[in-house]
Amino acid sequence: MRILQLPALRDNYIYLLHDPETATAAVVDPTVAEPVLDKLAELGAELVAIFNTHHHHDHVGGNLQLLARYPRAVVYGSQADRGRIPGQTVELQAGETVAFAGRQAKVLFVPGHTRGHVAYYFPESGDLFCGDTLFAGGCGRLFEGTPEQMLGSLDQLRQLPEATRVWCAHEYTLNNLKFALTVDGDNPDLQARYQQVVALRQAGSPTVPSTIGEERRTNPFLRWDQPALRAATGAQDPVRVFARLRGMKDQF
């Protein structure tokens, strides 16, 4: 399974999963249809699945146009997003699996950013498509969920193997790390990562994917149990630490 990263709009990433052996493809969170259609034509591949992480328009905006061209494609999304994902044909629950290219992806229920957010984790290849729950160096805003829900979702992702590649849906890394330095500035891993990200962005290169290990070492939203983050927030309870961090980031 090849993973092709397609930039869209200002800072979105669409992910096209390609199986050369069967000339089929699946897409994760098609912001818009055009770059997906162009790449499918270039590859000579048929779209067989759309994996949506949540209902926001910049993640489902291309669904219907893709279905017009590939009407047999199956559209996956959370059961909690029923009626909110265009063209949805399969309603997923936590613990279910979906398949592509002979590989099984676990459906992880990760509410917080939205009430129905899911992530798709391919354990065999070590790839996580987490939408707007976990970002490189950050996490999604809480539009529909609670701090308790988001903390539980991030803790679930934090426990995945360190080598897991994190394919998040936005290029927010540089700003996320600028904020991280204000609350965890003495962290040498964070300092080094910031310099690497600055160089990547100056070169016009993506900073995604990262890894779970890298996020555990440098992402403040996965480090709520570290003394530096407790000190920065003036809290000890994990939910309070997280909630205060999220509030600080919202104002950053």
Curated annotation (Swiss-Prot):
Zn(2+) 1 binds at residues 54, 56, 113, 132. Pfam families: HAGH_C (PF16123), Lactamase_B (PF00753). Disulfide bonds: none annotated. SUPFAM superfamilies: Metallo-hydrolase/oxidoreductase (SSF56281). Keywords: Hydrolase, Metal-binding, Zinc. Pathway: Secondary metabolite metabolism; methylglyoxal degradation; (R)-lactate from methylglyoxal: step 2/2. InterPro entries: Clx_II_MBL, Glyoxalase_II_hydrolase, HAGH_C, Hydroxyacylglutathione_Hdrlase, Metallo-B-lactamas, RibonucZ/Hydroxyglut_hydro. Its cofactor is Zn(2+). CDD domains: hydroxyacylglutathione_hydrolase_MBL-fold. Binds 2 Zn(2+) ions per subunit. One of its GO terms (biological process) is methylglyoxal catabolic process to D-lactate via S-lactoyl-glutathione. It is an enzyme of class 3 (hydrolase). It catalyses: an S-(2-hydroxyacyl)glutathione + H2O = a 2-hydroxy carboxylate + glutathione + H(+). GO terms for molecular function: hydroxyacylglutathione hydrolase activity; metal ion binding. Its EC number is 3.1.2.6. SMART domains: Lactamase_B. It comes from the Bacteria. Zn(2+) 2 binds at residues 58-59, 132, 170. Belongs to the metallo-beta-lactamase superfamily. Glyoxalase II family. Monomer. Thiolesterase that catalyzes the hydrolysis of S-D-lactoyl-glutathione to form glutathione and D-lactic acid. This is Hydroxyacylglutathione hydrolase. It comes from Synechococcus sp. (strain JA-3-3Ab). The gene is gloB.
